[in-house]
Regions:
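Core nucleotide-handling region used for phosphoryl-transfer chemistry
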Residues: 1-154
Length: 154
């Protein structure tokens, strides 16, 4: 599943969003035609399992170089300069402890590796814990399907 840009064009000032228009972002017209499936964006920290290895997302902001060994997720954003990458989670790095905890808490009984895919890390170690969880977890992207309106006014 590929995340699309904002459906309607954003207005920027100094690389910051200051508004939104009723114009459809070029390349997203298919959404208004009824194609595709909308899913809930879970609020946490993006991560992935790639070939059995656990990664967290790293955003090389405009002018910053990604860490050695980072895997690009996509091309750099031409407007903001942000360039997302995957960097391996290091179980020995204290900065990664919440990711390690989330991964381990999400394994099914007897499982040693999560399936390949992208996930959102949620819980007390992520984004202020908006879901009030007592433990960290990773949840697969695209699990909660919704059917919102497909116009600017919803």
């Amino acid at each position: 599943m590929k995340k699309i840009p904002t459906l309607f064009e954003r207005l920027y000032e100094n690389h910051k969003v200051v508004g939104i228009t009723e114009n459809v972002t070029p390349g997203c017209e298919w959404v208004l035609n009824g194609d595709g499936v909308a899913t809930v964006k879970v609020d946490g920290s993006c991560c992935a399992v790639i070939n059995g290895e656990f990664y967290k997302r790293y955003d090389a902001k405009k002018g910053k170089k990604p860490p050695v060994g980072a895997i690009p997720c996509c091309d750099p954003d031409q407007t903001t300069g942000h360039w997302p990458h995957w960097v391996k989670v290091d179980a020995n790095n204290p900065a990664d402890k919440h990711f390690v905890d989330a991964y381990e808490n999400s394994l099914a009984v007897g499982e040693t590796v999560m399936p390949n895919g992208t996930y959102e890390a949620i819980g007390p170690g992520f984004q202020g814990n908006p879901y009030g969880l007592v433990q960290n977890y990773i949840v697969p992207h695209g699990e909660i399907v919704i059917n919102p309106g497909r116009t600017f006014n919803g």
